[in-house]
């Protein structure tokens, strides 16, 4: 199994807008960090994306990632979900929407804020489906057991 941190910065990223580095040394290139998203890939090649940060487009491009099998959202804060629109291009060429997983309250809030992504409209296909999760129970996401 491979776990790739696509972003590991704070909710504002590092540096913050205004070139505020906080306690981070701007001379250290590793201190320039985008917001949190994680890609987990199992030995069968199934890819699970954890969270969709606002920096997701650049993270996918930088990582050469052109396919995911499922998405899991840890919670609905903006720094973990506002990259959801960048999943649209990953939906193209798929027979079905990308499966998405979240706790009940997070799923409810995602539907409220990004209803178009789960329902589709006009010329846009449905991007994502929201699948139920049972707390503390194993489930299959993509081709991975989590």
Which residues does each PLM region occupy?
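Binuclear metal-dependent hydrolase catalytic cores
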Residues: 1-145
């Amino acid at each position: 199994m491979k776990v790739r941190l696509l972003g590991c910065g704070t909710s504002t990223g590092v540096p913050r807008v205004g070139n505020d580095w906080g306690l981070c040394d701007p001379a250290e290139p590793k201190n320039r960090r985008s917001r949190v998203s994680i890609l987990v890939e199992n030995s069968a090649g199934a890819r699970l994306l954890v969270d969709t940060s606002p920096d997701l487009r650049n993270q996918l491009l930088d990582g050469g990632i052109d396919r995911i099998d499922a998405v899991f959202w840890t919670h609905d804060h903006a720094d973990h979900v506002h990259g959801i629109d960048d999943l649209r291009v990953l939906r193209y060429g798929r027979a079905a929407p990308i499966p998405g997983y979240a706790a009940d309250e997070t799923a409810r809030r995602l539907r409220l804020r990004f209803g178009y992504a789960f329902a589709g409209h006009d010329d846009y296909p449905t991007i994502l489906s929201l699948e139920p999760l049972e707390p503390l129970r194993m489930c299959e996401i993509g081709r991975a057991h989590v």
